[in-house]
Regions:
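Alpha-helical sensor/transducer elements of the RecA-like P-loop NTPase core
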Residues: 83, 175-241, 245, 252-255, ...
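P-loop NTPase Walker A phosphate-binding motif
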Residues: 46-79, 83-86
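Internal alpha-solenoid helical repeat scaffolds
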Residues: 63-64, 98, 202, 243, ...
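Helix-coil-helix junctions within alpha-helical repeat/solenoid scaffolds
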Residues: 337, 342-343, 422, 456, ...
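Conserved adenine-nucleotide phosphate-binding loops and their immediately adjacent elements
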Residues: 1-27, 110-123, 276, 280-283, ...
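Short secondary-structure boundary elements
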Residues: 221-229, 233-426, 430-433, 545
Length: 886
């Protein structure tokens, strides 16, 4: 890597950098002394301010003591996914064979390997967040193997998005790793996501010690450097003019002094007037004029190098310009002498990024486009991938070339396979501009919509709608496009529109597999839509459709799952719910093509399957399903929204089983993962609702309210169904806080919603139990009616949990022996239920009501085992103090 002050005064750009050099020395010393935690140095500042020189000092101080790996962003390669992280790890990766690489990376080999270029990608699109996590894990392993290790990244403002995403995640892990990370970037150059990632890195550094903004030289430092370079005879007026001309910019100062020395100028006041003109030759139009003065061959060679940007060899640059070997060598020599290029013939680079930028911008538009086109073909001819050629194809002017469209589509598939959907999106957008042939235009739009699904649901909607408005999609592809469009609409909160979109497409198809798939998706979105117009009619039609189905294919299995979920939410017989779910499985397992990572069917369908088992007291099957989801998503590197949802439902299975501490852990992790994906997403509602419910069971009201505040848990609610019922959970929170009037309003609203949708499952949505207790003091008749209705619905559903909870609710409205008798029956049911927390609640209440210390002690033991702290404390206090007996 070239240094800014190469061939000048080696320490020139390091004047007035004592604080930064001290931080470098201390950080390297700390690493070598074996500190368990990592270090981070971030240097920022304008172009030419000396950041690269400081990074060079890191290498000098570490020489002979540490392993140092370096990488550098490039202005012309920002579109190349994982360019910087591959460059950074190249010393470790280049020597690894496939077997060694697999051993080094372990379980992350299949996920991180393709992104690093050391493993072949699989055939499917991978989750970008999973790839980032895989890279963090992979680099963490390499850190342990190569300690003491220093990672140096220069010009991070030009790093590709994928590498920056990794860098931000890795910087947040440094407290756990013995590695020194050193990053340099310009102030204000990065925008959008790049700026956000660099801000994350900056936040991980400590201002004043490991985060430093470099400033320009003072006049005194400029004078000192001038005399060190040109001799003590440099007079004060000359030194002041050097500072005035360069503004104290270290790079410009060093370059200007080198030119003064090369020109043989006397550093005295009489020659100072020539400094401004001399300085202009090193930048902007002056640099271009200098380049043109070297001749046509040297100019074209510099243009080619600027277009290539990285991995520049004299042979490749000459090939792009059509120069012979001797002419190319002569041009390279001239460019080195003019301090434009540096390095050997196999590793040419520009002396400074400012020069590279100026040269690239000086290339006439037509010539630049032609050079990018030639570079793309050169990359392709060399046997490298379409993805590698794509950065050049992106710069070629559209010209109705079907071959370029095909290359860009291949590149997009390669980008998706390594976890770079943004890069794939850029390729397909450019392919669309070519434009494609009429017969493939709709397909390119479809591919563009699919590429945007994980990163831009709005883009997915626009592109898929455009694709569906055109001819050219195969029938199966068209059906898939409609399903993906509806999924994007749901993720954007437009559930009603998703339902209508599916319905219109299904109506135009003849009976067959595609139509049945659309029907299933239609009912799936209706099933989670809280604002559907005629829920009773939908349930009736779904019941009729599902009745004769045996589960012979995945469309039938999907309809059986939807029917089971509908029956569960409406509180129909739980045995029927379980029987329908079982019919949707193949030998007790998910059918091929209907797995957690299969794309034909949305994973929401499997959430419905697991949720149906969960609320029908078949926690064993729900746990197996969601644990499988968690395992598969982790193995596959799907660590975005899918993994967040899996953690949420694994956590809620623990909640239903009464493992409240474990449940809280999973649910907090779910929210952490969801926060990485975005804000106020449907997954946040589910996970927050489940966590608040769990914390209420534990008796941690303050923590529950913290979650409610952080995730804005309250009205207005989203238009999709939340599991468990959000209004019931919020009503319970309000009651626990003594905010009875607000709780009644919330629970009355839940009552109206249930009446509109005919969803009466007292386990999923126990609003009747809660409302009965809330209104009992002022309206005991209404409370009794609510409790009686809840009991009838619970007996209709038929699970031990539902009936036991209904009996416990009824007991809360009674006194004396009647209450004790009802609690005894509740305990009998809940003892047979898999829900240990509800059993503990009933057992404690029964022990207190019956004044039975043995029963209360059993309740205390159960409460402790569940992690229900407040319930356990209540039982313990009654046993210890003898107060509070029924």
């Amino acid at each position: 890597m070239a240094r800014e002050n190469a061939q000048a005064v080696p320490s020139g750009a390091l004047w007035e950098r004592d604080a930064e050099l001290a931080a470098v020395s201390a950080a390297v010393d700390g690493l070598c002394e074996g500190h368990d935690t990592g270090g981070l140095l971030v240097f920022t500042g304008e172009a030419g301010i000396g950041k690269t020189a400081v990074l060079g000092e890191v290498e000098r101080v570490a020489a002979g003591r540490c392993t140092v790996w370096t990488a550098r962003g490039g202005e012309t390669v920002t579109s190349v996914p994982f360019h910087v992280v591959r460059q950074l790890l190249q010393p470790a990766l280049v020597s690894l064979g496939p077997v060694e690489a697999r051993e080094y990376l372990g379980d992350w080999y299949e996920i991180a390997g393709p992104a690093l270029g050391i493993a072949q990608p699989g055939g499917r699109q991978v989750d970008p967040q999973g790839v980032v996590d895989g890279l963090v894990a992979a680099v963490s392993r390499l850190v342990m193997l190569h300690w003491p290790l220093i990672l140096v990244i220069d010009d991070a403002h030009w790093a590709d998005q994928e590498s920056l995403r990794w860098l931000a995640a890795f910087a947040e892990r440094l407290d756990d790793l013995p590695v020194l990370l050193v990053v340099a970037h310009r102030d204000g150059e990065a925008t959008g996501d790049s700026a956000r990632h660099l801000e994350t890195v900056g936040r991980a550094a400590r201002p004043g010690t490991s985060l430093a903004t470099l400033t320009a030289f003072t006049p005194a430092a400029t004078a000192g450097l001038t005399r060190a370079t040109l001799g003590e005879g440099a007079d004060d007026p000359f030194c002041r003019e050097v500072w005035a001309v360069t503004g104290g910019n270290p790079y410009e100062t060093v370059e200007l002094l080198a030119k003064v020395r090369a020109a043989g100028m006397e550093p005295v006041e009489s020659t100072a007037g020539a400094l401004r003109e001399l300085n202009a030759k090193a930048r902007g139009r002056g640099l271009v004029a200098t380049l043109e003065g070297l001749g046509t061959d040297a100019t074209k060679l510099a243009w080619s190098a600027a277009v290539l940007g990285t991995n520049i060899t004299l042979r490749l640059a000459a090939e792009l310009t059509g120069l012979g070997t001797e002419d190319a060598a002569h041009g390279a020599r001239l460019l080195r002498e003019a301090r434009i290029l540096t390095g050997g013939d196999d590793a040419l680079e520009f002396v400074h990024p400012l020069i590279a930028t100026a040269v690239y911008q000086s290339v006439p538009a037509a010539a630049r486009t032609a050079l990018h086109g030639q570079a793309a073909w050169a990359v392709t001819r060399s046997g490298r991938s379409a993805a590698e050629a794509s950065r050049h194809l992106l710069e070629v002017h559209p010209d109705d070339d079907p071959e370029i469209v095909d290359q860009l589509r291949r590149a997009a598939r390669e980008h998706l396979a390594v976890g770079a959907p943004e890069a794939a999106y850029r390729c397909l957008e450019r392919a669309l501009a070519e434009p494609p042939l009429p017969e493939t235009h709709a397909t390119v739009l479809y591919e563009l919509g699919c590429a945007a699904l994980l990163t831009s649901p709005n883009g997915t909607v626009a592109h898929l709608r455009a694709a569906l408005a055109m001819d050219g999609l195969e029938p199966g592809t068209r059906t898939d496009a409609v399903c993906r469009l509806s999924q994007a609409l749901v993720h954007l909160g437009h559930v009603s529109e998703a339902v209508q979109t599916i319905g219109r497409e299904a109506a135009r198809l003849e009976p067959g597999p595609d139509r049945m798939r659309l029907q299933a998706v239609h009912y799936m979105w209706e099933g989670i839509h809280t604002g559907e117009a005629d829920a009773l009619e939908r349930s009736r039609v779904l019941r009729e459709i599902a009745q004769p189905l045996t589960g012979r294919d995945n469309s039938e299995r999907a309809l059986l799952i939807l029917r089971a979920f509908d029956a569960m939410t409406r509180g129909e017989n739980a045995e029927l719910v379980v029987e329908l779910c079982d019919r949707a499985l193949v030998n007790g397992r998910l059918a091929p093509g209907l797995g957690w990572t299969d794309t034909e069917w949305s994973f929401e369908l499997l959430i419905m399957l697991g949720g149906s088992y969960l609320f029908a007291d078949r926690l064993d099957r729900a746990e197996a399903l969601f644990a499988e989801a968690l395992r598969i998503y982790e193995i596959s590197g799907w660590s975005g929204g899918h993994l967040a949802i899996a953690h949420a439902f694994v956590g809620y299975v623990h909640r239903r089983r009464g493992r409240l501490v474990e449940a809280e852990g999973y649910l907090r992790e779910s929210l952490r993962l969801a926060d990485r994906v975005g804000e106020e997403l449907p997954m946040h509602w589910d996970a927050a609702c489940m966590l608040i419910d769990t914390l209420l069971c534990r008796g941690h009201l303050g923590r529950a309210q913290e979650i409610a505040d952080r995730y804005h848990f309250g009205p207005p609610y989203p238009s999709i169904l939340i599991l468990p019922d959000a209004q019931s959970v919020r009503g319970r929170l309000l009651l626990a806080q003594g905010r009875t009037k607000e709780a009644i309003d919330e629970l009355e609203s839940a009552s109206h919603a249930a009446a509109e949708t005919d969803r009466y499952n007292t386990v999923l949505a126990p609003w009747q139990h809660l409302l009965a207790r809330a209104v009992a003091p002022r309206d005991p008749r209404r409370a009794a009616e609510l409790a009686a209705d809840a009991r009838r619905q619970a007996e209709r559903f038929g699970t031990d949990t539902a009936i036991g909870e209904a009996l416990r609710c009824a007991a809360a409205l009674e006194t004396g022996q009647r209450a004790t008798s009802l609690l005894a029956r509740a305990v009998a049911y809940l003892e047979s239920s898999p829900c240990a927390y509800e059993h503990a609640e009933a057992r404690v209440a029964y022990g207190i009501a019956a004044r039975d210390a043995g029963e209360l002690t059993r309740g205390l033991t159960l409460a402790r085992a569940c992690g229900a702290d407040t319930l356990a404390a209540r039982a313990r206090d009654v046993l210890r103090e003898g107060r509070g007996w029924g």
